[in-house]
Structure formats: structure tokens, C-alpha cells
Amino acid sequence: MPHSTNKELIFGIMVGTAGISLLLLWYHKVRKPEKTMKLPKFLSLDNTFNSITLQDEVHNDQGTTVIFQERQLQILEKLNELLTNMEELKEEIRFLKETVPKLEEYIQDELGGKITVHKVSPQHRARKRRLPTIQSSATSNSSEEAESEGGYITANTDTEEQSFPVPKAFNTHVEELNLDVLLQKVDHLRMSESGKSESFELLCDHKEKFRDKIEFMWRFARAYGDMYELSTNTQEKKHYANIGRTLSERAINRAPMNGHCHLWYAVLCGYVSEFEGLQNKINYGHLFKEHLDIAIKLLPEEPFLYYLKGRYCYTVSKLSWIEKKMAATLFGKIPSSTVQEALHNFLKAEELCPGYSNPNYMYLAKCYADLEENQNALKFCNLALLLPTVTKEDKEAQKEMQKIMTSLKR
């Protein structure tokens, strides 16, 4: 038999086999639908969440439901991990781009016999107390797992003794202050962006003396939150967030009726959640809301709390179907909020403190734009232009408001 005929015969057999396979597949899907399992409509754009349950979508089979929920959670965890890794990779690439030219310059200086002085960023300047005897100890990141208040496990929980200390080149004298003077000074320093690092250092200098004083404790936790905001390094941010959360949790345990302790615990839970997987993100979100509500009851005249509550409501109102379903799987109910509820909280912050902040005006403009009240949205954009731009958050808010104004004028 010619070679070409063999090839035609083989090809014919392959086509025939494929046809039979397709026929069998059609038979199982069309002729026997009762034996197939319905899959949930992940891509549905219908936002009706009132009576949908995972059990309805998997034939009310309890065992299958549990397995499906576990697989769903695993898939979401993997996707979240992938996104986190991509962000970390971007950060490392950016760091390398900045470092390589400096490394070349350093090598040239060393070869030329020059002595190089290393510059330290403000967030690295966490001072060590001067001790009578020099103690040397190896510092390492804690790998112990600590169970938090929410009843779940968080790895790599730091303590306040673990920091990024750098020897001071000058001004090694530490002025000893009494508690009232210290608190007034750190509160005043914190009013400016540049003073936050100095405020943090001042608290570090006095932590051994006042570490059990509740007014010192929550301010120290707040200062770690400030350092989180100032830092641009991912590992540093994670470090500051974990220490601050631990300190604020201790403060709550010592003074459960102090609203500031609950406020900063909520804020630092939000910071820590940035480095967690999806399940812990949702857990920390639950803690954030819980302690924010407690803080509002204890400090009803604090505008910052209503700003935070507004941000929470606005974020929840924008959650996707799958994110709401995940929260329902973990906590038994779907988190719900509306743009109107967010708007109410932002307006409350403005009522308590007119001209409260650029970010508050930005979110007011966003809410009104979402509600198609364009005149009110433009009103708050214009009011924001009258406020000074001091912090990094102020600058970001101004940029966002420029975008809002551009979109509203189209």
C-alpha cells in the first residue's frame, strides 16, 4: 500500500474517533442532564443577593457544598496570592532600579579611596535607649504564630522590641520628660507630616518609662501607624503594622472603655490586612467594623471615626458579587452598605469639623457623583481646592478630585 494511502487511512481513523467522542459527550450532556451537576453562575451580572445560597446551586447536597466552598476559597486565595506576589515583584524591581546606580557610585567612591556616609531615611531612625552596658543580640523576625482577638491565626507577629534601629550620628542626649509634657509634645509634632517621625522617636525614647500608661500606649500604637504611612518599603510597612496592631490590642485589654484604643486597633487591623490572604482580609475587615462601631459609641464627637466609617461603607457598597459571597460563607451574612450610608458618614465628619480634610471632600464628591448629583459633587471639589495640601493622602485626594471634575464637565 502506498505511503500516502497509509496516511489517509490513519487520518480517517482519527476523524472517526473524534466524531464518536463528540457524539458521546453530546449524549451525556443533552440526553442525560439529570446526571450532571449545575455550576454556580459566577459570571452573572444580576446583583440579586437576597436568597441566593451556595446550597441551591449544588443540588442542596451538604457534602458537595462544603467541598465546593473549600475549592472556591482555595481558588480565591491563589488569585490573591498571585496579585500580592506581582505587587511585591514590582516593588523589588523599582528598588533595584533605584539601587543599582547608587551601588555603582558607591563602588567608584570606594575604589577612589573615599569614605562614604550612608544616608538613612526618616522611617529608619527608630532610636534605641542608651543603656549603661552595651548589649548585643541577634535580631530576627518572629516566626511564631499568635492567635488574635478574632480567633484566627496570623503568622510573623512582631513585638515592639523588634524594630529597625539605626545608631544616631548626633543628638544622642535623650531629654527625659514627664508624661503630660511628653503627650502634649508628640500630639503637637504629629500635626505636620515631617514631625511624625520625630514624634515616633520621642515615644520610643520613653517607652520603658511609660509603657504601661494607657494614654502612652494608644499613642505609641498610633505612631506605628504613622510610620506605616511614611514608609515606602513593603517589609517595613508590614513590620510597623504588626507591631502597632499588637500594641493597640494590649491597650484594649487594659482599657476596654477607651475609644482611642479601639480606634487605632481598627486602623491598624486595616493596615495589617494589606499583607494577608483573602480569608484573613475578610476577618480583619470584620474586626475593623466591630471596633470602629465601639469607638464611635465612646467618642461620638470624633470626626475621624465618621470619615473611616464612610470609607468602610463606600468600599462595601462597591464589593463584587464573589467578594460578598465569600464574606457570607465565612460570617453567615452578606456585608451590605450603600453609597447613601457612606455619604451620611462623610457629611457627619464635615458637620463636626468643617473643612475636615481633603480626602473627606474627595469621598463626598465621589458619593454625589455616583448618585448623579453633579452640582454637589463639583461643590465639594471646589471646596477642596481651598484647603492646604500637607500630607501624601492630601496630594492623592487632590489628584483624584481633578479626575472627578474632568469627568463631570464632559
Curated annotation (Swiss-Prot):
Give residue numbers for the modification (Phosphoserine).
S51, S121
Q: Which UniProt keywords apply?
A: Coiled coil, Cytoplasm, Cytoskeleton, Membrane, Microtubule, Phosphoprotein, Transmembrane, Transmembrane helix
Q: Where is this region: Disordered?
A: 122-151
Membrane-crossing residues? Answer: 10-27
Positions of disulphide bridges: none
Q: Which domain of life is it from?
A: Eukaryota
Pfam families, from UniProt? RMD1-3
Q: Which residues form a coiled coil?
A: 68-110
Where does this protein reside within or beyond the cell?
Answer: Membrane; Cytoplasm; Cytoplasm, Cytoskeleton, Spindle; Cytoplasm, Cytoskeleton, Spindle pole
Q: How does it sit in the membrane?
A: Single-pass membrane protein
Record's InterPro entries?
A: RMD1-3_a_helical_rpt, TPR-like_helical_dom_sf
Entry similarity comment: Belongs to the RMDN family.
Query: What protein name is recorded for this chain?
Result: Regulator of microtubule dynamics protein 2
Source organism of the structure: Macaca fascicularis (Crab-eating macaque)
